Amino acid sequence: MEIKQMLVPVSRYSVLCPYEMNPTEITFHNTYNDAPAINERNNVANNSTGTSFHIAVDDKEAIQLIPFNRNAWHAGDGTNGRGNRHSIGVEICYSQSGGARYRKAELNAVEVIAQLMIQFDIPISKVKTHQERNGKYCPHRMLDEGRVQWFKNQCANRASSIKNSNKTQETGKVEIIVNKFNKVVTYEFGTALVPEMLGMMDALGYESRIISYGDKQGLVRFETAYRQGNELDKATAWLDAKGLKYFYTKE
């Protein structure tokens, strides 16, 4: 996903990002409002409190406002805390009311965080919530819905997928991994099933992800790399029980 640069003026660095930084971690947040990314960027650029973060992600775009080689004040763990001094802060928009816009913002954040993990060689163990930094109840919507681990799994799976894709492009060869070469792609289904579906896939150990929200509001498409054998029957039986239609592909 493209990260649009709209950096704050250098004159604001002394307040918003006074220290140089070599990012080794990532912290993700919910904004707790229903404003788009551009509003979040502008609020930080003009505030006098010093509160800041690196990227705001909504359902349409990701905007970077602080350079990745500067710190930002988003983690609440003090002047020398790892969150404030060593992590890239990612704010996910539209979390107050939720709905389709928020779900899409979440999926966009997965893409952004996965890209950052690869760019800065950050392992998933260093991708943390605001709550893990200083105890604040954030990201509030993910915590309310019990989906923090699901979100982290999505980031890890997406980063792995991008790495494998890059490796294939570099070598010019298609690498076939035993037990992971068949994909199953669902047709469109409602967002209400997303946490349950991906939770089930995670429990079975599959690499899976949402691939599209489709043309209809609130409808998504999903793919997973299935292993062959008895586990395949368990997963497809679950899809069948939910009345979800799917097809197999090796592409």
Curated annotation (Swiss-Prot):
GO terms for cellular component: extracellular region. This is N-acetylmuramoyl-L-alanine amidase CwlA. It is an enzyme of class 3 (hydrolase). It comes from Bacillus sp. Its EC number is 3.5.1.28. SMART domains: Ami_2. It comes from the Bacteria. The keyword Amino-acid biosynthesis does not apply. It is found in: Secreted. GO terms for biological process: cell wall organization; defense response to bacterium; establishment of competence for transformation; killing of cells of another organism; peptidoglycan catabolic process; peptidoglycan turnover; sporulation resulting in formation of a cellular spore. SUPFAM superfamilies: N-acetylmuramoyl-L-alanine amidase-like. Retention of enzymatic activity was limited to the N-terminal fragment (AA 1-196). Residues 1-37 form the signal peptide. Autolysins are involved in some important biological processes such as cell separation, cell-wall turnover, competence for genetic transformation, formation of the flagella and sporulation. It catalyses: Hydrolyzes the link between N-acetylmuramoyl residues and L-amino acid residues in certain cell-wall glycopeptides. Keywords: Antimicrobial, Bacteriolytic enzyme, Cell wall biogenesis/degradation, Competence, Hydrolase, Secreted, Signal, Sporulation. The keyword Cell cycle does not apply. The lineage of its organism: Bacteria, Bacillati, Bacillota, Bacilli, Bacillales. Belongs to the N-acetylmuramoyl-L-alanine amidase 2 family.
